[in-house]
């Protein structure tokens, strides 16, 4: 049985991560949060081939850092436009997004699923972090359902 959640998907071409996040992305996501309630940002055309890395004169580690920096900056722009509950996937992504929001101390409020915390920072910013390789194919859907049940 396949479960679905209404969500707005924003696919950002990997080439865009080499510059500042465009305000258009932030505005589209903020608007979609008002309409749909769930927005997903995904880096598309993610090519980690040796050729891609050579063409950009970077290593895999540097590309990963560039992507997470971009996502952190985009998160800041979105939060400036719209209140939200941040759900981030991946340790480095979570760190960069929280850092961009100045969320240095997170207080554990609940556990959405095993090892997936619901936290609150001193600015009343809600944050859910999920390790990149933790969970199963339904984990993100379960997080959305948890949030819907606890509105």
Predicted feature residues:
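Active-site catalytic microenvironments in core metabolic enzymes, especially phosphate/sugar-handling
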Residues: 1-151
